Structure formats: structure tokens, C-alpha cells
Amino acid sequence: MTPPKLPVREGRDALTPRPVSVQRGVNPHAPGSAHLKMGRTEILATVTLDDKPAPHMRGKKEGWLTAEYSMLPRSTTDRQARERNLQNGRRHEIQRLLGRALRSSMDLRPFKNQTLYVDCDVLVADGGTRVASVLAGHAALHDFCDRLINSGQLSEWPIVHNVGAISVGLIGDELRVDLDYEEDKVARADLNVIATDTGLLVEVQGGAELGPITVDEYTRLLSCGVASVQDVMRELTPQLAVIQGI
């Protein structure tokens, strides 16, 4: 039997992530915002500060951060119905992932009795929307915290880790970093790796798609993912110093 034709990458090798760019301060109504591009995938992230504590955080010494995720109807090749079901399984799973990832980066004690909402909306989807949302959410939080510091509303920088994310997968027997949509469709295993820019692991999500893989293959995916997050953050972090919107 002839093996299936694997997607060919244009302009990058198997271990090179797609170019990442970000613009801060793109929403004049939000106290923190960012528009992030990762290849053809685009995410708009905004931060809102609510003066109400999350129910489970009442009386605690720190605030809470929660995330929401949504895809525009024409973010994909074919129009999909606008999301109205708050119990959508995939959406709920991604929102929990985003919340955990972004909370790991923040000292929330300055936000006692308050709740931070990070909204991530997919404008264009070409694979990796959840990892791009982690990056966009982190950029929007950076924008938010920078504005609070500059306005005197905060005295100490509350972001304790620069957190990023990347997808890694096995396409045939080849390990590839930052899968686009065509690669994601045929991957026999893929992981979403969330880590800090110093190489500390935050979360791993994913597994085998087309049958079991070996422990060695999983370990290689994980190690490559953590290293690739550091590569992406080296490209992204300097851009966070520039406010290009408001």
C-alpha cells in the first residue's frame, strides 16, 4: 500500500515554529489587549478587571483569573455556526487550559476581591488556536499590567513567569513543531505544551491519534515542545515592550 502523502512545509523546517508577531493595545475599550499572529492563525485577546470576587475566592487573600475562548464563524475555511452553547465540550476544555496556563504566570494577590477575565477570540484558524491563545492572553495581560504600573494603580509587577505554548506532533515518523491545520489533521500524535520562557513545565495536553506511541516518542515530543516554547518566547517577548495600538 502506498503511504499517504504528508503535508509539505513552506519556508520552514520540521523544528521551526511559524513566525509570531503581536500588537498591544489594539482595543480602546479594554484595559489590556493584544492581537497575535502565529503563521496564518490570528487571535484577539482582551483583559477585563471585575471588582467582584469569584464565588470560591471570597475572603481569600488573592483574586482570580478566568479565561473564555471563542471562534468567529468565518475563522475557518467553511462558516461554522456562532457559538451559543456554553457547555460546548471542546470550548470548555480549552477555556480551562487557558485559565490554568495564565494563572500560573500571575501573582494574583494585588487583585484581592477582584476577577480578571481574559477573552480570547479566534479571528483566523490555521491550527494551534489554543496555544496561540495562551500567547495572546499572556500578551494582553502584559499590556494590562504595564498600564496599571504606569498609571500608579500597581506598585509591583504581578507577572511572575512569562508563559508560552506550542504544539508538537508526529507526522509519519517525523517530529514537527507548531502544526498547521493540514498537519494537525494527519498527525499520529500531537501535544500542546505550555511552559515558561525558562523551561519550566506548566501543562501538557494531547496524546496519540492513530494508535499508541512509544515512551521515547512521547519524551522527544515533550522535550522538543519545551525548547520550542523558549524559542517562541525569545521572539515574542521583545515585542511586548512596544505599544502599537492606543
From Swiss-Prot:
CDD domains in the cross-refs: RNase_PH_bact
Entry EC number(s): 2.7.7.56
Region ranges (Disordered): 1-33
Listed InterPro entries: ExoRNase_PH_dom1 (IPR001247), ExoRNase_PH_dom2 (IPR015847), ExoRNase_PH_dom2_sf (IPR036345), PNPase/RNase_PH_dom_sf (IPR027408), Ribosomal_Su5_D2-typ_SF (IPR020568), RNase_PH (IPR050080), RNase_PH_bac-type (IPR002381), RNase_PH_CS (IPR018336)
Binding residues for phosphate: 90, 128-130
Family listed: Belongs to the RNase PH family.
Biological role stated in the UniProt entry: Phosphorolytic 3'-5' exoribonuclease that plays an important role in tRNA 3'-end maturation. Removes nucleotide residues following the 3'-CCA terminus of tRNAs; can also add nucleotides to the ends of RNA molecules by using nucleoside diphosphates as substrates, but this may not be physiologically important. Probably plays a role in initiation of 16S rRNA degradation (leading to ribosome degradation) during starvation.
PANTHER family per the UniProt record, alphabetical: EXOSOME COMPLEX COMPONENT, EXOSOME COMPLEX COMPONENT RRP41
Protein name listed in UniProt: Ribonuclease PH
Record organism: Deinococcus radiodurans (strain ATCC 13939 / DSM 20539 / JCM 16871 / CCUG 27074 / LMG 4051 / NBRC 15346 / NCIMB 9279 / VKM B-1422 / R1)
